[in-house]
A protein has these predicted regions:
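Short helix-perturbing small/polar motifs within transmembrane alpha-helices
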Residues: 2-5, 13, 18-20, 27, ...
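Hydrophobic transmembrane alpha-helices
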Residues: 2-61
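Membrane-helix interface segments
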Residues: 11-13, 57-62, 112-118, 145-146
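Hydrophobic alpha-helical transmembrane segments
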Residues: 15-20, 46-50, 60-66, 92-97, ...
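Generic alpha-helical transmembrane segments of integral inner-membrane proteins
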Residues: 19, 23, 27, 50, ...
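Interfacial aromatic-anchored transmembrane helix boundaries in multi-pass membrane proteins
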Residues: 29-40, 68-102
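Membrane-embedded alpha-helical hairpins and interfacial helices in multi-pass inner-membrane proteins
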Residues: 37, 81, 114-183
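Structural signal for the C-terminal ends of transmembrane alpha-helices
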Residues: 54-58, 105-113, 174-176
């Protein structure tokens, strides 16, 4: 293999992995249980945590940007097989955009430590940031109080997201130990 071919392969690998994780995000988003609030329970947060934990700040955040942009141009990657700017402009849009913030926080911390508990802490911070951004967005669009927004969009999801954090941290730790994903 000549040097030029090796360089192209090395450059392409992270982008391919980002594409794979963006596809994982879509599949995780499709597995959803609708709620009366309009914010469904789905596995998207698990996808965000896995991509950021495995890929770090740069590529974890890039993966979420790709995912959001694919949805914005109309591909049905969001919950309920939806896509388009109307989804981002709607009540759940803040949570979807918040995935980028979550990935940035988790990826930044995860790439700087090998500690399982630091990874769990990073994931908790990332999910809280996503909750904050998404809930502020929801409260603004729905013209409700922040307390009502928390009651509708955060509190019902806490047990599910705690499970997702635990599962993601365990999977990321295991993937790190096996060196399956190298960037």
């Amino acid at each position: 293999m000549n040097t030029n071919t090796k360089t192209k392969a090395t450059t392409a690998y992270p982008l391919v992995i980002c594409g794979v994780f963006a596809a994982v995000m879509a599949v995780c988003s499709w597995i959803a249980i609708p709620l009366p609030s309009g914010v469904p329970i789905n596995l998207a947060v698990l996808g965000v945590l896995l991509s950021a934990g495995c890929l770090g700040f740069k590529y974890g955040t890039l993966t979420q940007l790709v995912y959001v942009l694919l949805g914005c141009v109309g591909l049905p990657v969001f919950a309920g097989f939806n896509g388009g700017l109307h989804v981002i402009a709607g009540p759940t849009g803040g949570y979807i955009v918040g995935y980028i913030l979550c990935a940035g926080i988790v990826g930044f911390i995860a790439s700087r430590t090998k500690s399982f508990w630091a990874l769990v802490g990073a994931m908790i911070l990332g999910v809280l940031a996503c909750y904050a951004f998404g809930t502020l967005w929801y409260v603004h669009l729905m013209d409700i109080t922040f307390a009502v927004g928390l009651a509708q969009c955060v509190i019902p999801f806490l047990p599910f997201d705690a499970i997702k954090i635990a599962l993601a941290a365990l999977l990321v730790q295991r993937l790190r130990q096996t060196n399956l994903i190298k960037l």
